[in-house]
Amino acid sequence: RKPGGAGPDQPAARARAERLPESDAAAQARASTDPVQIGSVISEEGRRIERPRRERPEVPEGAELVREVNNRFIFRTNNTYFIERPREERFIIDAREVYYEELPRSRQREVVVRPDGTRIVTIRNRWGDVVRRVKILPDDREIVLVYVEDDYYDEVLEWRDPGLDLPPLDLDIPVRDYILDAEWVEDPEDYYTFLDQPPVEQVERTYSLDEVRRSARIRDKVRRIDLDIINFEFGSAQIPESEIGKLEGVAEAMQRLLKENPGETFLIEGHTDAVGAEVANLALSDQRAEAVATALTNVFDIAPENMETQGYGEQYLKVETQEPERENRRVAIRRITPLVAPVASSE
């Protein structure tokens, strides 16, 4: 049923429940009738360049750069603020080498070489949107993390919400099976069981990371864990040392999923309460998401390339109030793998 709406009649509910995807592969079944052929991200010849400047070279039509805050850029598009970082600094910590190449059609390739020879290769389009990301192991085996289909590879030309082409989400499961509140988790196994579930509806195609970040409608295709057990102080993105242990349950679930599929991608979302300026809250929420991702890497050895972070400020309040509210100062986690990579690439 639609969240907050009246329950449907039982026969209709059963019919829709039968259409719920039973796996990631089933969710992507309509995306393409042909097997996905993924070419190597390093096969295309590129020209070595210096590290790109922090400033974005171009901004899509309809988007306006509003401010730079703590090495983050805040844009306004369609009367909505959005924050992003020009590069994911978490990826290059302790790297043996990092280099950049210019590719045809105004694209750039970033290669991060780890001490053991593993390479993280990311291709961005002219706006900086991630359209390909692959982890290449020392034995040259490639693990696809992000893959935008060729039909859309060069068409991610503007910041248009792909969710505008979809009807409202018609949720066919109880909300408790769609959003897991960490505060009520008694058995850590619940984290794994929850994250392992497929999307709640069909995935029309694979999306770029930035399309997923910017579109609530696309993100809502997958389930969400609200980590409201991590208590952020007002105005702070720092995780108190006493709170880090609370990440253990979800970290173990992520480790288990990554052992089964090293190509998993998790989105860490940051949120704030409604106190303060909207732009400042956006930057703070992004820092909170990054703080959790960093802790998951430093303490629990979750590889940084398997996590994406995004702050949403006060856009999605858990408790509708303009007053200080600890429950709104939170992070959330989704497994977005079936949204950004073909299932066949990880099997």
Spans of model-derived segments:
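Extracytoplasmic
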Residues: 60, 68-70, 78, 105, ...
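Conserved nucleotide-binding/hydrolysis modules and their immediate coupling elements
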Residues: 90, 94, 98-118
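Periplasmic peptidoglycan-binding/anchoring modules of Gram-negative envelope and division proteins
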Residues: 209-220, 225, 232-269, 293-298, ...
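Periplasmic OmpA-like peptidoglycan-binding domain that tethers envelope proteins to the cell wall
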Residues: 242-244, 264, 271-347
